[in-house]
A protein has these predicted regions:
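Conserved ASCE/P-loop NTPase catalytic core
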Residues: 1, 78-309
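OB-fold and OB-like single-stranded nucleic-acid-recognition modules
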Residues: 1-79, 191-192
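Structured beta-strand/turn binding interfaces of compact recognition modules in eukaryotic regulators
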Residues: 31-33, 184, 226, 377
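Basic, amphipathic alpha-helical bundle interface domains used for macromolecular binding and assembly
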Residues: 234-236, 244, 253-255, 261, ...
Length: 407
């Protein structure tokens, strides 16, 4: 019999909602009540419904324009505002170039052309996990993958227990579709896991096969790889490119898919040590537990989250002049560096994926500014951050000195 006097049509509709949830990874809400019968809970379901899509920003078009107008009046860019230590970075010290990389990563990719992956390889104890915990997770949704054998292909992608579509258990990647994934201690992963990531990182989707089933699932996620150099690495006999051996058998394929790669033993530099120690002691003293401090930090995080969701939907347009400037800066300045040749052209004389990533980087900076068009300032920022990223592949300089123009 149909519970609660529901018709067969309403029951069928509820079952369809549950089936679509299993297929697409959407969240469902269930309303009803339960009674205790013989020490067991018996649930009586009233309604089954698809929950609201939380990827949609609550910021309206007029609110966005008012905010951008205020920034223009005060002669401050939105990106500069979100990089202030008093806003989103109260609990973590980082040089500006790393802050920019994190803000780019926090955009929500809408399709494979928006994907922006970052690699950060540094020495132990540099606070990479703290970066995710104190900056990224409070700001935007991010899935954190396990390290070593705790991270499995089934856990990342999903698994099928039979030949029926309803038996699919979705993994972390499809659950975080249009969001982000952080990989902590990636150097402990089995190389086979990296191999399975190739299609996801490039195309934002993956295929699963079992029995007679061959299905495709979305996995449009920005990825950040945080890890340490391989055991064999040392300052005396290796250069920074050797750090990338942490990616194992698929090093060159992963490199081709990473928009930005930072490889250095220090992400901050010696002058920052005192500031980092100050942050540690402030946290231990409970500074960030103060109600007023927490209220202000939460305000910035909520506003930043809605702003990032809103601007992620912008499709910045490129004029003919801008297209020419992107081409010239890429071919004349980015591609002609020694680091680019060593990292990306060892296996092939062409890597069109890097050109696509550079163009996407220009568009991403436009989004962070809330701009409907790509301007020369966005190209300049994209060029600078990519040059700094590649410079760390060849030279062991701290990021704050690199960002200041050290050559």
């Amino acid at each position: 019999s149909v519970p609660e006097g529901h018709s067969n049509d309403s029951l069928e509709s509820s079952l369809m909602t549950l089936r679509e949830s299993l297929r697409n990874g959407t969240n469902v809400g269930i309303e009803g009540c339960y009674h205790i019968v013989n020490r067991e809970k018996v649930f009586l379901v009233h309604h089954v419904y698809t929950m609201k899509n939380h990827q949609t920003s609550q910021m309206t078009d007029s609110q966005l324009q008012d905010f951008l107008a205020l920034c223009k009046k005060l002669r401050v860019r939105p990106l500069d505002l979100f990089m202030q230590d008093e806003t989103l970075w109260s609990e973590f010290y980082a040089p500006d170039v790393l802050k920019k990389a994190v803000m780019l990563y926090c955009l929500s990719p809408q399709n494979k052309g928006d994907l922006l992956h970052i690699g950060l390889v540094t020495s132990m104890g540099e606070g990479k996990d703290h970066l995710i915990e104190r900056v990224v997770q409070p700001l935007v949704p991010v899935g954190v993958a396990g390290s070593g054998k705790m991270s499995t292909i089934a856990g990342l992608f999903g698994a099928m227990s039979g030949d029926d579509l309803s038996s699919i258990e979705l993994g972390l990647i499809p659950k975080m579709n249009h969001e982000r994934l952080a990989v902590s201690e990636f150097q402990t992963w089995d190389s086979m896991v990296f191999g399975e990531l190739m299609n996801v990182m490039a195309n934002g989707k993956f295929e699963m096969q079992k029995g007679q089933l061959d299905i495709s699932r979305p996995g449009c996620v920005n990825m950040m790889f945080l890890g340490n150099p391989p055991k064999s690495w040392d300052d005396e006999t290796h250069n920074n490119l050797d750090m990338l051996e942490s990616f194992g058998d698929y090093t060159y394929q992963i490199l081709s898919r990473l928009t930005l790669i930072f490889t250095q033993m220090s992400i901050s530099g010696p002058d920052a040590e005192q500031l980092i120690e100050e942050k540690i002691m402030d946290a231990m003293n409970g500074k960030f537990d103060d109600p007023e401090v927490k209220r202000e930090m939460n305000m910035w995080r909520v506003f930043g989250r809605e702003y990032l969701r809103k601007v992620s939907l912008i499709r910045p347009q490129m004029s003919a002049e801008v297209k020419g400037l992107i081409r010239s800066t890429y071919h004349e300045q980015i591609k002609n560096t020694k680091a680019f040749e060593k990292a990306f052209l060892e296996r092939s004389k062409k890597d069109m994926r890097k050109y696509q990533e550079y163009t996407n980087l220009c568009r991403a900076f436009a989004r962070l500014d809330g701009s409907p068009t790509v301007e020369w300032t966005h190209i300049a920022e994209a060029k600078d951050i990519m040059e700094i990223s590649m410079k760390t592949l060849m030279e062991n300089f701290p990021l704050d000195e690199l960002a200041a123009g050290m050559t």
